[in-house]
């Protein structure tokens, strides 16, 4: 068992998150966060230093495309992922880079290849976890009276031929990294 902090964005409350995870570690609980890594490095590190595993999202390597979809560029995120992959394993932690595959946004070969090459160049060979797109959040937007930003996109299932082709491309471009598809194949050891 263990404790996972996710969001929203856990780093928006980094001081509380860091103290919570410190107490968990003191009590021998496995600790994990899920983050976009969009925060100052010192905020991220205050939290990550107490984690056994950090799941970090890599949405797009092109900063303009990233900005168009998320509202922010990716420079801080890429820098933080790079530092995290260098620093966390020194403390016995593990980084898993997750690439959510959104049809028409980042699931073309060029975008996928750029992400795979980035991950392949990171220290300590983090796992690359490919996340098939799902539209489960659409109903939440409806409940709060907001427009869903990706209307009409269908969820993809784990063994979709396109997803398998993306996984094969990533395995070819990042041969020293474990490349998993969906959440069921993640190595947390």
Protein language model regions, located:
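Conserved AdoMet/S-adenosylmethionine-binding subsite of the radical SAM
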Residues: 1-136, 142-143
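Auxiliary Fe-S-binding modules of radical SAM enzymes
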Residues: 103-189
């Amino acid at each position: 068992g263990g404790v996972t902090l996710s969001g929203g964005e856990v780093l928006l409350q980094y001081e509380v998150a860091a103290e919570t995870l410190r107490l968990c570690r003191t009590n021998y609980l496995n600790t994990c966060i899920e983050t976009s890594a969009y925060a100052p490095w010192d905020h991220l590190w205050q939290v990550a230093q107490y984690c056994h595993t950090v799941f970090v999202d890599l949405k797009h390597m092109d900063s303009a495309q990233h900005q168009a979809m998320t509202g922010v560029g990716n420079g801080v995120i890429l820098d933080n992922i790079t530092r995290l992959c260098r620093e966390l394993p020194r403390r016995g932690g593990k980084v898993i880079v997750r690439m959510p595959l959104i049809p028409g946004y980042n699931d073309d070969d060029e975008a996928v290849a750029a992400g795979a090459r980035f991950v392949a160049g990171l220290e300590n060979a983090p796992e690359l976890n490919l996340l098939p797109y799902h539209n489960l959040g659409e109903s939440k937007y409806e409940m709060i009276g907001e427009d869903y930003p990706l209307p009409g996109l269908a969820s993809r299932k784990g063994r979709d031929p396109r997803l398998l082709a993306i996984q094969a491309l990533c395995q070819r471009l990042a041969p020293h990294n474990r490349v998993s598809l969906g959440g069921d194949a993640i190595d947390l050891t």
